[in-house]
Amino acid sequence: MIKLWPAIDLINATSVRLTEGKYDSEVKMARSAEESVLFYNQYQCVDRIHIVDLIGAKNQVSIESDYINQLRSLTDKPMEVGGGIRDRNTIDTYFNNGIDYCIIGTKGIEDLAWLSHMTQAFPNRLYLSIDAYRRQVKINGWEEDAGLDIFDLLQQVESLPLGGIIYTDISKDGKLEGPNFEITQQLVQATQKPIIASGGIRHQQDLAQLESIGVHAAIVGKAAHNATFWEGLS
């Protein structure tokens, strides 16, 4: 089965979801971040927990690291963190505190030499987050246009020892309308790197379709708070 990585998005140590990455669409989730981690601990099919520091992503500096350390202590499952990671010191701090993988976005996209250096220092432990409105890459908490096409960016990082590529179609994110299967499949075909799909995933049928097109893992946000999503999963 496709790997399942449920997401916990944080603003001020509160678990929230946004729609299309718009900060004014913030909705507090019924389960707290702590409750979510404990809930996901029950499922063998969850092989990683995906944490995003939303204000960190917007403000270009890690904000939630102390709270994320508390969440880390609640689970033995691998944990990855993204949002506001712009320097080696932040990566070192997360890794030293038991975080297994870090997600690089804006800094890596704007400074490929730095990204190359970091991936050499931490091979297969860094993931590049490519967040796009359809094919146009967005940066700084999805609020600015990077002036790049996702496939051009993918080609530029193909030789780097990344753990994989996390692709989010912003136009789908938080809507529970299904992921962008077409572009996701094109990305799978365009790279040797694992592609992780994010944004819009609704149910197990979406997971099955993503698996059928070669997606390595699925990051599930809003749907993971629906009881029906978990029916039949162990």
From Swiss-Prot:
SUPFAM superfamilies: Ribulose-phoshate binding barrel. GO terms for molecular function: 1-(5-phosphoribosyl)-5-[(5-phosphoribosylamino)methylideneamino]imidazole-4-carboxamide isomerase activity. The active site is at D9, D131. Signal peptide: none annotated. InterPro entries: Aldolase_TIM, His_biosynth, HisA_bact_arch, Isoase_HisA-like, Isoase_HisA-like_bact, RibuloseP-bd_barrel. Its EC number is 5.3.1.16. It comes from the Bacteria. It catalyses: 1-(5-phospho-beta-D-ribosyl)-5-[(5-phospho-beta-D-ribosylamino)methylideneamino]imidazole-4-carboxamide = 5-[(5-phospho-1-deoxy-D-ribulos-1-ylimino)methylamino]-1-(5-phospho-beta-D-ribosyl)imidazole-4-carboxamide. PANTHER family: 1-(5-PHOSPHORIBOSYL)-5-[(5-PHOSPHORIBOSYLAMINO)METHYLIDENEAMINO] IMIDAZOLE-4-CARBOXAMIDE ISOMERASE. Belongs to the HisA/HisF family. This is 1-(5-phosphoribosyl)-5-[(5-phosphoribosylamino)methylideneamino] imidazole-4-carboxamide isomerase. The gene is hisA.
